[in-house]
Amino acid sequence: GLPAVAVGDCGTGVIPVSRIQCPGDHSPFAGQTVSVEGIITMDARQQGGFRGFYLQQADGETDNDPKTSEALFVYTHRTDGQHGDRVHVSGRVKEFHGLTELTDITSITRCGNGRLPEPVSVTLPWQDGEPPEHLENMRINVAGELTVINHYNLARYGELTLAAKPQTMATEILEPGPGAQSRHRWQAINRLLLDDGL
């Protein structure tokens, strides 16, 4: 465990998360060992979880660039830190199935209690057909009501598919063809997957 506050590494040698994320799909720091500092916004290290936690830059420390994410996933079995803590983390940057994360963690230092970053407000549909890269790993708040349209994986994976409006199979209301295909694409960009992290 950690003492109440361990500040030896805090505030030193850190790279802003947004620089690691960058505006593109692949981090320029991939394969390099870096140190970052931020707030644990979700801890998913419990049994059956994602084997890590989400770390986001504190409000007031962001680059204010709407094209870059301010958060990373930290893949680790280390138990240091908990939800809401500000931590200093050192590890290797890796792109894992399109997700920028830190792995091979060499240290996690608790720097005290942090304040959770404010969630970013988003609306559906996704403008480019899928959740934007600049929201990767970040806290979000979806405007408006959402409808559960699929709960097949709820018991096994804790997943729900949510949509901005109720949805039906396109061919239930349209003849197979371009019209049904267009509606299917429209429905796809009006969905998101909610996972409980377990």
Model-found features: residue ranges?
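Extended non-catalytic accessory segments flanking core domains
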Residues: 2-198
